[in-house]
Curated annotation (Swiss-Prot):
Positions with biased composition (Polar residues): 596-610, 618-632, 797-813
Biased composition (Acidic residues): 31-42, 956-978, 987-998
Oligomer and partners: Interacts (via N-terminus) with SMARCA4/BRG1.
GO cellular component: cytosol; nucleoplasm; nucleus
Pfam families: zf-C2H2 (PF00096), zf-Di19 (PF05605)
ZnF (C2H2-type) ranges: 94-117, 124-146, 164-186, 192-216, 827-849, 855-877, 883-904
PTM per Swiss-Prot/TrEMBL: Ubiquitinated, leading to degradation in a proteasome-dependent manner. Deubiquitinated by USP51, leading to stabilization.
Basic and acidic residues compositional bias, start-end: 17-30, 428-444, 470-479
Modified residues (Phosphoserine): 237, 246, 602, 609, 616, 623
Subcellular location: Nucleus
Membership in a protein family: Belongs to the delta-EF1/ZFH-1 C2H2-type zinc-finger family.
Protein's recorded name: Zinc finger E-box-binding homeobox 1
Disordered: annotated span: 1-62, 222-251, 419-444, 469-512, 557-632, 779-821, 937-1043
Amino acid sequence: MPEDELPADQTVLPGGSDREGGAKNCWQDDVKDDECDSDAENEQNHDPNVEEFLQQQDTAIIYPEAPEEDQRQGTPEASGQDENGAADAFSQLLTCPYCDRGYKRFTSLKEHIKYRHEKNEDNFSCSLCSYTFAYRTQLERHMTSHKSGREQRHVTQSGGNRKFKCTECGKAFKYKHHLKEHLRIHSGEKPYECPNCKKRFSHSGSYSSHISSKKCISLMPVNGRPRSGLKTSQCPSPSLSASPGSPTRPQIRQKIENKPLQEPLSVNQIKTEPVDYEFKPIVVASGINCSTPLQNGVFSGGGQLQATSSPQGVVQAVVLPTVGLVSPISINLSDIQNVLKVALDGNVIRQVLENNQASLASKEQEAVNASSIQQGGHSVISAISLPLVDQDGTTKIIINYSLEQPSQLQVVPQNLKIENPAPTNSCKSEKLPEDLTVKSEKDKGFDGAVDGSTCLLYDDCPGDLNALPELKKHYDPEHPAQPPPPAPEAEKPEASASSARDGDLSPSQPPLKNLLSLLKAYYALNAQPNSEELSKIADSVNLPLDVVKKWFEKMQAGQIPGQSPEPPSPETGTVNIPAKSDEQPQPADGSEPQEDSASGQSPLKMTSSPVLPVGSAINGSRSCTSPPSPLNLSSARSLQGYFCVADGAQEEPQVEPLDLSLPKQQGELLERSTISSVYQNSVYSVQEEPLNLSCVKKEPQEDSCVTDSEPVVNVIPPSANPINIAIPTVTAQLPTIVAIADQNSVPCLRALAANKQTILIPQVAYTYATTVSPAMQEPPVKVIQPNGNQDERQDTSSEGVSTVEDQNDSDSTPPKKKTRKTENGMYACDLCDKIFQKSSSLLRHKYEHTGKRPHECGICKKAFKHKHHLIEHMRLHSGEKPYQCDKCGKRFSHSGSYSQHMNHRYSYCKREAEERDGTEQEQEEAGLEALMNEHVGARASPSQADSDERESLTREEDEDSEKEEEEEEDKEMEELQEEKECGNAQAEEEEEEEEEEMDGAKDEAAAKTDGAVENGAAPQAGSLEQKASESSEQLSEETTNEA
C-alpha cells in the first residue's frame, strides 16, 4: 500500500481507551498491533518493516472515504471495558470502516476489505449492502439475510401454511410451539437446564437429546468445586460398606443411569415448565437427616440417617432429574419414608430394621449393611432410583428402603436432607429389609422383586427373599404383634425405638408381624405361587413349606382375618407413622392385616376409628401443631386394592385422634363407596399395583389416607396431614407425597409440600373421584384417584380436569371419562392453575408435570409430545416421503429435514444435480465418439489407413475401444429388445448380422494388410478389432435366439 495513503499521525493511543484519533490513529495503531501480536514482541514499538511490507503489496486498497470518528466509537468492538474496568480485547480491535467488524491484525483487516468490500469483475456483490463474495452460492446464501421471511424458500408443497411468524427475523413456522421455542433464540431464554452439567437449553429437543446422550452423567465437580447436593458418595457409617455382591439392578439403567440427584428445590419453586433449579426446602414432618448420595441413578439414603429432628421440620426434598422431562422430580424423603413405613406393614420393616440393627444375622443383610440407620434415626429409604422410563413411556421409581425404629418413625418428621448423594452400591441403609419396588402390576409387590424374588435395586438387597432370613431366625409364630408405643421424641435412641416398636419383643426377635408382612409382600407379589416359588418363600422366611403353603391357601380363601391389631397369626403388622404435627411427630400406629380374599386382590380390611380432626395433623402447613399422637394405620387388603387407614386414637391421644382408618369392608372397599371412618374414599377395583400413590391437591387442613396398592401404604404427609396413598381411592387433599403409577408400571413417588402445588411424577395415570369425607370439617374436597376414576380436584382456581389420555393406557380401572371441561368450557390442569382452550394443549402441558408424552407410536412405542411429531414419525414405518426437493428430486419424510435441505440446498443441491447430469452427458458423448471412431476405423479400407496413425495405436487404446464397443453393443442389445417388443426384432437382427459379417470380413482384410505392411502394434490392433466384432456378433446372435 502506498505510504501516502497511510495516516501520517504516528500517535499510539493509550490502552485503547482513547480511540478518538479517528481513522488515522486506528490504522496506525493497528500496524503496531500487527507487530505486537506475538508474545515475545508484545511490548515492542512500531516496526518500520511493516510499512515497508505494506508498500511492497501489489494490490492497493482504496478506501472510498475515511471512516468516521463517531462510527468507530459507536461500534461495540471499538469501545468497551470488561467488568473489571480494564480495557477488553475488543476495544483494541481495528474495525472495518464498512461493516464495523473488528480485527486485531491490520493484515486481517486488509484481507477482509479485499474479499468483502472490494468490487471487481470476478466478485459477486450484494446489491443491498457492500459485501462481495467470490462465489455466487455465497451471495445467494447471504441474500437470505435480507429477505423478510426465510420461509419464502419453504413455500413448496406443505410450506405455504406457515402462519406463525417471528417478528424479529421474519421466519415462519407451522406450529405455535415451534415459534415459541424459536423466540427464545432472540430473547436468550434458556429454561431447560441439565441437572448434571448445568448446561442450559432453549429448545426442549436439544435438552432431551443432551439428556439422552448421557455425556454429562458423571459426578464431576463444576468449576472445580463439588456441587452442593451432589457430593461424592460418602459412607460415614462404619457399617456402611460397599458390598461387591450387590450391583445395581439393570432396571435402574435406562436413560437415567448414573444421573446424580439434583439439588433439592422447594415445591413452590417447581413449575410446570423448566425453571432454575435451586434448593427448595419442603415443609415436611421432621425428617431424618439422610445425607443421601446418588449413583448409577440410585439415590442412596443410607448415608447418615440421623433421627435428629429439625425444629423447623423442614426437609430437603430430593430432586430427581427427570429423564427427558422438563422439570425435575422432587421427592420429599420424609413423605416417602412415611409411606414406606406403612407400605409393607411398616412395622414389619421397622422390626426388621431393629432386628438387623440388633443382630445382622442374615448374610444378605450384612452384605447390604447400609448402616447409618443406627444413628438414632433410621432412614426408611436406603436408595431411590431415578425415574425409569420404559419403552412404552411408563415411568417407575424404585425405592430401596428400610424402616426406622418405631421411635424414629414416629419422629419421622426429622430433618431429612439429601445433601451428599453417595453411590448406592457403597452406601445402603444398613437394614434394607425390603427392597421396595413400586410397581403397578398385578403380580408385582413391594418385595422389590420384579421376578417375584429378585430385588429391583440390588441383587443382594436384603429386601424380598434376602431380608426374610433375618426375620425367620427370630420368627415367633405365637408372639402376637403389638403396636409399639409411639416414641415421643425424634431423638429417641434406636434401642428404645425398637423395643417400643414391638412391644415386648426384643430387637433380636422379630415379631410375627414381620414375618406376616413379608409373607403379605410375597402374597401381594404373587397371590398364587407355584410349588417352586413357595419353596423359595419358605426358605427365605425359614418356615416350613407346609406352613407357608397353608398360609397362602388361607389368604386365598380369605380365612385369615384382615384386621386384628395384634393378631397372633400372620395377619397384621403395626406401623407407627409419625405424622408431622408441627414440631412433634405423630406416630402412626398402623396395623396391616393380612389380605383377606381368595384372589390376590383380597380386600383390605380397615379399622374404622374416630374421624380425624382437620385441625390437628391435617393442616398441610408446617404451622399446624398438635401433640404427637400415634396414627393407627391398620390396613386391610381389599379385594382389589389396599387401603391404609390410620387409627388416630391410640397411644398418645391427640387433640383429636387422627383417625385414618377405613371401614372394614372386604368387598366394598373396592367399590366407590364412602368409607365410614375419616374420609370417603372413592375406591375402584384396582389391579394390585404396589404403592400407587395418587397425588392430590389438598388444602392445608385436608387429610386422607387411603392406599390402593397391594402394599398398604398409609402416609402422614410431612405436613402433619396423613397422606392418602391408597391406589383404589385417593380421598385426601394432601399436598405432600404423590406417587402415581401407570397401570402396568411402577409408580413414581413425589412429595409435594405446598398446599396447592402438587407435582406428579412421570407416566402417571390421573383420575379423580369427587368424594368428600363427610367427616371432613373442611369444604368437600375433590379427590384425585390414580388410575382411572376422575374426580374433580379441589382447586380454587378451577375445577380439576383429569385427562385419561395422559394415562398410559390405563389397564386397571377404566376411566369414567376423558378430559372434562371446566364451567366456562376451558380445560384446566389438575396439577396447577393453568387453563387451556384445547384439550390437546392441556395434554401437552401435562407433559411438563408428568413427563408422559401423550402421543405414542403403536409400532415402536415411542412417544411424542405433539401429535404432528407422531404423524411424521409414522412415516418412518410406512416409508411415505411427501416432501420433495424441486431441484434435485430428493424426497423427505419429515418436514424439518425437508426445510433444512431447502435452506441449504443452494450450496450443494443444484450443483450436485448439475454435476451428475454433466457427468452422465460426458460419458454418453465419450461413448458415442468412441463408437463412431471404431466404426469408421473398421469400415475404412487398409489402403486408406495411414500407417503412421496405425503405428500410433497402442494396445491400451485398442482395449479401451474394445470396452467401448462392448458397451455400445450392450446398448444396442437393449434397443433391440425394445424393438422386439414392437415386432421388428427379427428383421433388425438379421440386418445387424449381415452388417457385422461384412465388418468382420473387412476387419480380417485390414488385419492381413496390417500384417503385410507392419509387424508391430497394427496387427494386434486388427486382431483385437476382429475379436471385438466377433464377440459382438455372437452377443447379437444370442440375443436374437433368446428373442
